[in-house]
Amino acid sequence: MTHKNILLTIIFGLFMIILSACGMSNKEMAGIDNWEHYQKEKKITIGFDNTFVPMGFESRSGDYTGFDIDLANAVFKEYGISVKWQPINWDMKETELNNGNIDLIWNGYSKTAERAKKVAFTNPYMNNHQVIVTKTASHINSIKDMKGKKLGAQSGSSGFDAFNAKPDILKKFVKGKEAVQYDTFTQALIDLKNNRIDGLLIDEVYANYYLKQEGNIKAYYFVKTAYQGENFVVGARKVDRRLIEKINKAFKQLHNKGKFQKISYKWFGEDVYSKE
């Protein structure tokens, strides 16, 4: 064997070792549907923002809880699969998914045309709207009242994406025609409370629940926006078509059994199941 062939053999061997180490961690590279793998391992990893109440968050006791946590656990219980919850940087969620670090994105994840280029979606299971939360004392009661005011938004959120995609709705009014970006909504709400920003573009479901839990919702005002209503969906790799089908099937089964409603009433006091 020549030195050249030996070198090529070594390089190929190293490549195979690296590829083997990645194994099923990079499922997109394999280009296969992974449902049988999830069934065999009886485990699936879901990425989420562990500050996004009431959808999925870390409680004071350190447990992961929330509407999406309960719903996902119920969905995969239908198939005898346990869920491993993996906190992630929400701004990197699609990268984490397609790199194989997580198997699903599930945490108040809105369906958008831009995201559809990167991931596959389940059917919608809940609807949501973007609002601007302001302090009642500020007398900011409309979008036009935000003229020259400082706006906050979460990086990578659907609200921030809409803010940039449709500048005539809100962006043209706010100070500097830009939003102060935050890693979490919790951080942004703290700044709103302390008057470091004048308004916060946020998911209505999050704001309503969070401020009610804080016991001071009357101190805040919800400004409606003209952004299109959103559908909450689960995001998967495009190769995982059977996984999508199984989740959609479980949504219907849980609703037919009344289990979806039970989870919904626990967190929202009503049935939020999407009819779409």
Label every PLM stretch briefly.
Residues 23, 69-78, 144, 149-150, ...:
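Extended ligand-binding regions for polar small-molecule ligands
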Residues 26-108:
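Extracytoplasmic small-molecule ligand-binding "clamshell" domains
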Residues 37, 134-151:
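Flexible hinge/capping segments at coil-to-helix
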Residues 50, 127-134, 204, 212-252, ...:
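Periplasmic-binding protein-like
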Residues 58-59, 72-81, 159-181, 211-216:
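Ligand-binding cleft/hinge of the Venus flytrap
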Residues 92, 109-117, 162-165, 190-194, ...:
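A ligand-binding cleft/hinge motif common to bilobed small-molecule-binding domains
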